[in-house]
Structures are given as C-alpha cells and as structure tokens.
C-alpha cells in the first residue's frame, strides 16, 4: 500500500505506545484531514500526543477535504467524516480507522479499512516491531478491542513465521 488516510484514534495510540514511526516505513504517504489534526490537538488529547503533533514530522501530511461530504456521514464525528471523505477523494489504498460506526460507514462508501491492530500486525510482519509486545503496550492504554481479535492477529503472525 502506498497511500493511506488515518483517523484520529490510530495516530493517538501509535504515538502513545511509541510505534508511530512504523507508518512511514509501511506506507509511502500518510495523510490526515484537518479535523483529525484538530482532534489530535484538542484539550482532552494526551499530552504526549499533543507534543508529538505540535512538531509532527514531514511524512504526516495534513490535507483539507475539497469534495463535499455526503449526508450519510453526518452521524459521525468530524474526524471520521473528513477521514472517510479524504480517503474517497484521494482514492487512498486504505483508511486506518478503529471506531465501529466509522468503519461500517467507510466500507459502505467503498473505502478499504484497516485498524490499529492490523497496522501493528503488518509492522511486525515487516520486522519493524514485536507484535506481542506492541499489543501488550496497547492493552495498557484506553484502546479497546476484543481479546479474540488480538489473539487472531497473534495466531496469524505465529503461523506466518512458521
């Protein structure tokens, strides 16, 4: 994959677990919409993430959505709406998004979605991180995923190495 758009949550948690550097190693272009930038600088955002965003690296592109967003996106928050819209506008290879409602709507709109767990799985497959350790760090944040999902990725990774 070369071009991905990200929603707020994946950037937030990858920064918190010190694995944000895998993104430019996995993807040629990593793009977020303006609303995601604003959410990552919001008052409720963890300090570590705000500090990282204040001087974010050049590989993280911030773009404004130009194409009008569809009415069906109105039920989502601004970051999700703009991330889906930008992924469509740019014909991105995928959208990194974890929120269930956003994932469903993105898929309904024809956008390929992956989540934070998949990004870490792909990073581990590329030798960029230890998957079990990354997942363990993620479990010590407020990130939530069903234990079966963690287990499925760990099993796939184990089979891949065998």
Question: Where are each of the predicted segments found?
Answer:
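Short alpha-helix plus adjacent loop in nuclease-associated cores
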Residues: 114-125
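Active-site-proximal, substrate-binding regions of enzyme catalytic domains
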Residues: 2-94, 100, 107-111, 133, ...
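C-terminal structural segments of small proteins and small subunits
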Residues: 139-141
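Positions that flank functional sites
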Residues: 102-103, 121
